[in-house]
A protein has these predicted regions:
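Alpha-helix capping at helix-to-loop junctions
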Residues: 81-92, 116-120, 135, 150-157, ...
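Amphipathic alpha-helical interface surfaces
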Residues: 78, 122, 140-143, 170-173, ...
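Active-site activation/catalytic loop segments of kinase-like enzymes and analogous catalytic loops
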Residues: 144-182, 198-212
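Catalytic activation segment of kinase domains across protein kinase-like and atypical kinase folds
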Residues: 98-99, 108, 115-153
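ATP/Mg2+ or Mg2+-diphosphate-binding catalytic cores
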Residues: 202-248
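Short, surface-exposed acidic
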Residues: 183-193
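ATP-binding pocket architecture of kinase catalytic cores
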Residues: 1-111, 115, 122-125
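Short, polar/flexible loop-turn hinges at active-site or ligand-entry regions and domain interfaces
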Residues: 61-65, 136-138, 156-161
């Protein structure tokens, strides 16, 4: 299995059947002035080459900078800028091939895994967005729900986050993310159920891909990620009404 490597200002990554479409998306983003994404450089049979996005990814455990309100707010604004730029991507039923099926209602091209670890930071400011392998057409709230789940965070475990915040703080961070993104009222009303749906879909993906022998997902399953997400689904279901009220 190919690995991600960096040489100077270029990053070499494993390519998939969807990579040509992702490269067209990345080129479109830059044409629209969204320069926070990598630029496509080359595409081979098994590897793609994109530009390196300078900064620090928000990996776990979070630093004080990544856990800050400023990092949350700038991440939300970055997501909004990405969605606005991607909305005009010229889609083609004949040429497009994404790693995931379209999700209705299609409003833009969503990132598919918007989280701190796929954002790049300069101190407390989100300045870049990477890893577009899961991009696909869909509703804006699909990405916002994933982001709120990660940034609040609404996880019950300690593997995926840093210091666990109390519910009131999580709700406040969720509301702040929605404000910074300028999420519409309809999407706010379905945010909690969309978070739950996205986690259920992710568990299904982990189990399906692990059964097919995908080494990444075999590892995820062995490390209890599916069980963690199931626990998070139960937590979200328990507090769905409070989440909906907080972000309204």
């Amino acid at each position: 299995m190919e690995r991600i490597t960096r040489a100077d200002d270029r990053v070499h990554r494993p390519a998939g059947p969807w990579t040509p479409t992702v490269h067209r998306l990345l080129a479109h983003l830059h044409e629209q002035g969204f320069v926070a994404a990598p630029e496509p450089i080359a595409l081979g049979d098994t590897l793609e080459t994109v530009s390196f996005v300078p900064g620090v990814a928000g990996e776990y455990p979070w630093t004080e900078d990544i856990a800050s309100e400023a990092a949350l707010v700038t991440s939300a604004r970055l997501l909004r800028q990405f969605h606005d730029a991607a909305a005009s991507f010229p889609r083609s039923a004949e040429d497009d091939l994404w790693s995931q099926a379209d999700r209705a209602p299609v409003e833009t091209v969503v990132h598919g895994d918007f989280a701190p670890y796929n954002c790049v930071y300069d101190g407390i400011a989100a300045v870049g967005l990477i890893d577009f392998d899961t991009a696909h057409p869909g509703p804006r709230v699909w990405d916002v729900a994933s982001a709120v789940y990660r940034f609040a965070p609404f996880t019950t475990g300690t593997v995926e986050g840093s210091t666990t915040a109390d519910l009131a703080e999580r709700l406040a961070r969720a509301a702040e993310f929605c404000r910074a993104y300028a999420l519409d009222d309809r999407s706010r009303g379905v945010l909690a159920e969309t978070m739950i749906a996205s986690l259920v879909a992710f568990v299904t993906t982990i189990e399906h891909e692990a059964a097919a022998g995908n080494p990444k997902f075999v590892s995820d399953l062995q490390h209890g990620h599916a069980d963690l997400y199931r626990a998070d689904v139960a937590y979200l279901e328990q507090h769905a009404a409070a989440i909906t009220a907080a972000v309204a």
